[in-house]
Each structure stands twice: as structure tokens, then as C-alpha cells.
């Protein structure tokens, strides 16, 4: 009951300072909303006793002006209609000003590669729609920083993403439908970095409800260390903008300046791949990258980039750069073999596996993992298999496919064992892929099978080959 006298006195002070609404009931509701809003977002709670003791309304007027200034309203110091209207709009649950306990000292991640995990799902959207919205939201920040992100399916990630209602274990309960949509914590261990979404909202892919992508992009800005912005055009403005044209969405300059003040501009970082000195970047000793006869030994993704291996070199293709970069394999990973047979990435383990002959190696970024090489037969392949031609891992199904001559085996990444019922004929399950597979990787929802100097674009949903391309078409040749 301690809160009741405070609330009543607050009503007396504010109502005596300026007129609010005609209805006393509206006055009470407005005062209650004002108190909660200022307590939640403008640090009123620690100051309440001070202005009560002084019997002076100047502090509450000052707090209202502070709120109005931050939200871009006219600084009347009064609970006018424009202020009331904005206070009723859906918004982020993170405070706008004042000391927020999880944001001391402008924290940031002390690494460039960050993992995330979607702990549970809202029933409002298909799982793949939630996955896509979160991936797209992270991409917004990845495109303007050196940061890269990968998703894991179990264990503790840097950013744990969850949907919840009411009290959900962090002592910052959600309020039901409307108003508070989500909240997130600044970078750090434990709960820090995590993002929580109110599952009492109606989450949508468009703006007919609460758009998950827009809210996620905002909250993940907090997970990366950003505060709220006072600029209404910014993604980090605290109030949700349902009128946003999703087809024309882009970060404001204020958002870009803020995130780059923490992490810098989009350049390669040591946590992804350390670019060697120019003396190590040699001209190809094999076929030039635009040669019509060029073929690859292996192809794999690595943290959003694509690596094309050939002899003792590899081309590194990033979405941020129009042209691939060419390096010695040994300049990044001294122990890896040249003329490798296959390579694939398991994104939820942040690991790339490299195969040559009957052995395989493992790398994480520029780090070579201990305990390798291992025999390919430890994976459950029969002794008759002497080498692997190509491999790819499906991050959604958590299955890895090993291609050997005209057959393939399937490995369960969760159980860490080969699945029964294999091998199967490649041509039966991948119609149109009739020749031997040299390499394979996934991009844009398609599988790209390489055979000699050609590649087949395969639609796994339609189960058919959609295009036949040159192997080096990725190099703008």
C-alpha cells in the first residue's frame, strides 16, 4: 500500500499545476500511466521521495519535459493530448534515459563473431518465419559493422532469444497486449545480451500486427550495446512505428553512427579471418579465376562468406566485396592440406570440417582445432569408403550429407551418428544431379552442385535442377 499515497499526492501536485482532462476518472488513469511511464523509462522512482518531501511540483514538470524532449514533443511540461497519445503507443521496454543497470560503461562484445539461439517460438508465425525475421534483423547490423553472427541450436549462446508472457524470470514482467513489446540487455555474460519478446502481442511478417523483424532489429541493437535514440527516424527510437514501409527499410545515419562508434566499419576482423599481409596474397598458380576450365577441389561457407578451394590456394568471397580475394591456405591455416577433397560448415558449432583422403580436420574462424586430423571412419562411414567427394550440412535439419561417387550418406549432427538406410543413390534424391559431385554448398535457398567446370543450381523444395552455370559464376566472370 506504500504506492497509493505516492500516487494520490502525485495527482494533487500535477493537477494543481495545470488542467488535464474533464473527467476525474481520466485524470486518475492519466496520472497512473504518467507515473508508470516516468518510473519505467525516465528514472522517476529514485526521485519520488525528493519532490514529495519538498512539496514542490517542479520535479514532475521537469521529468515530463525530459520525456517530451527525448520523444520529440513540444516541451510543455504538461500532460497534454500529444504526450498522452505517444505514451499509449507500443514501445520497447528498455528505459530511454537514466541509469539502466545492464548498460554501464557503454558495453560491447569483445569479439567480432557472435552466436545466437532462438530458445522458443511464438505460435503466431511458422518457425521458419521467426528464423528468417531474426536472421534478417541481425543482417541489418552485420552489414554496417565487422560483426558476424551464427545460430546454435543448443547450449548457451551470446544472445538468447525467447518469447514469454508476464513474469518470465528477469524481474521485468511483460504487461500483456500493447505498450511494451520486448526488451533486451546489453552485451555481457549470463542474461546480458539476451532479447525477450512479449508473446501476448500478435507477431506478424507484415505490419497488420506487430512486425517481428522491426522489433527484433531494434532489440538486437540493444543486445549489441546501443541505447535508445531521440531521433524519430532511427530504428533505435523507443516507440514502435507501425507505418514503416518494410520494402524501403534502412538504418538511419544515427543508427549507423551509433553502432560503428562501438565496433567500427565493415572490415575483416581477427575473430573471423585475419587477412595476411600483401606478400602472402599471391597471384593464382592454377587456372585464372575467370578461366572457362576452372574447377574447385572443395567449397564451403564460413561465417557468411564462401571459400572456394583450389590446389594450395582459396578464393574468399564476401557479400561485402564485389571481387573475391585470393590467398594461400597455409597463410590462414598452416596445418591444413592442399588439394583437399571436401569441406562443409556446421553453423551451430561454428566449425568448418576439411577432408582429404581418409582424414578430416576442423577449423573455427582462423583457429585450427586440437584433436585433428581424425579418420573419416570415426563418422560411421564403412571401410570401403577411402575418400569423400563433397559434403554439406543442413542447419535446419541438422543433417550432414556425404557424397561419394554416385551415392551419399547422411549424418545426424545431433546424435553424432550415421543414419540407417544409407547410402542412397544421388540421382534418386537429387534428380538431375547425375555426374560425380566435386563440391556443394547452399545459398539463397538453393544447393549448388559443382562438377568439373560446371555447377547445377538445385531447388530442394521442387527437387529439380533450375540452372546450369559455370563454376566461377560467383566471381562476376
From Swiss-Prot:
Binds 4 Ca(2+) ions per subunit. It catalyses: Preferential cleavage where P1', P2' and P3' are hydrophobic residues. This is Stromelysin-1. The gene is Mmp3. Zn(2+) 1 binds at residues 168, 170, 183, 196. Its EC number is 3.4.24.17. Gene3D superfamilies: Collagenase (Catalytic Domain), Hemopexin-like domain. Its main location: secreted. GO terms for cellular component: cytosol; extracellular matrix; extracellular region; extracellular space; mitochondrion. Residues 18-99 form a propeptide. Ca(2+) 4 binds at residues 297, 389, 438. Its cofactor is Ca(2+); Zn(2+). Keywords: Calcium, Collagen degradation, Disulfide bond, Extracellular matrix, Hydrolase, Immunity, Innate immunity, Metal-binding, Metalloprotease, Protease, Repeat, Secreted, Signal, Zinc, Zymogen. Ca(2+) 1 binds at residues 124, 199, 201.
